[in-house]
Amino acid sequence: MMHLLKKILRIVKIDSNVFAEIEKEKSSLFQGFIIVLLTAFSNALIARQYLFSGHSAYEVPVLILIFMWVFLNWYVLSHIINFLCCKIFSDGKKLNKKKSVLKLIGFSYSPELAKFVILFFPNFLQVISLGTFIWVITCQALATKIIFNYKSFLKSLGIVILSYILQILIVIIFVILIYNFF
């Protein structure tokens, strides 16, 4: 447990060496899952406290949707990043690193754990949310740079941003299809 906390602190400090260590460890996929679970829990608590307080009819379905969204986001974003890095921006290398990307993207959500502070300081909801989002993007770009041995941080940052754009488009298409189906 202490080992996981030390890794989380090093990720939060954006220590590039910890990403390489995590990529090599076999147990780090489960640890990445734990971080994503804690992130989902913090987001669900914030939504319950500040967005849906007083609307008990919506509480449970929304909390379930938040947990599902966080885990789908982790899984889909990891696969989009892996696809873009392996197929489109491969630099001639044909390495498929699905598991490594899943591990490190899970760990890159560590800054989101700072959202627990919002429970005590609700006036900083927007500032902390935006700050942790930028922090997570930075961690994901660094993880992408390390996994795929890119020389440029900007290239990996562009891939992460493109991955988010593609994920948003997938969600929009999915919502349109569901809306038209029902």
Predicted regions and their residues:
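Selected alpha-helical membrane-embedding segments in polytopic membrane proteins
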Residues: 1-99
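Juxtamembrane "helix-exit" motif on the non-cytosolic side of transmembrane helices
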Residues: 47-54, 118-119, 175-179
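Juxtamembrane boundary at the C-terminal end of a transmembrane helix
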Residues: 168-182
